[in-house]
Amino acid sequence: RRNSLNARVTCVSVNALEPPASALWDFDIIACNPPYIPTGDIPGLDVSVRDYEPHMALDGGADGLDFYRAVTQKWKSALRLGGTLIFEVGIGQAPSVEDILARNGFEGIQTTADTQGIWRVVEGTVNR
């Protein structure tokens, strides 16, 4: 409300591993904080995370990159020309996610560090 975005922002909750319904096309921005922990790393997580966070919110597949591949491939067409796909990434995953975006035709790929200096956000633009 403070920024008068209510009429201009739509939040949706969908299965990101499936292609979007045609009603969900024409986004300017898709922001995604997918599960990114490699399956084999989950048993070693701190108990406060491992035992209390839903497993589906943590498990990013064998290498932690399953959701990045799926969302990049299946949701690219839902972005407008000039639209941006923004991902939160796990520690050390930024180069792999940059590569996934590049291989899927995204341009202007940028990576941003968090307040601890860890590369945490990767984004790319669709310029078909």
Each model region followed by its residue ranges:
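S-adenosylmethionine
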Residues: R1-N127
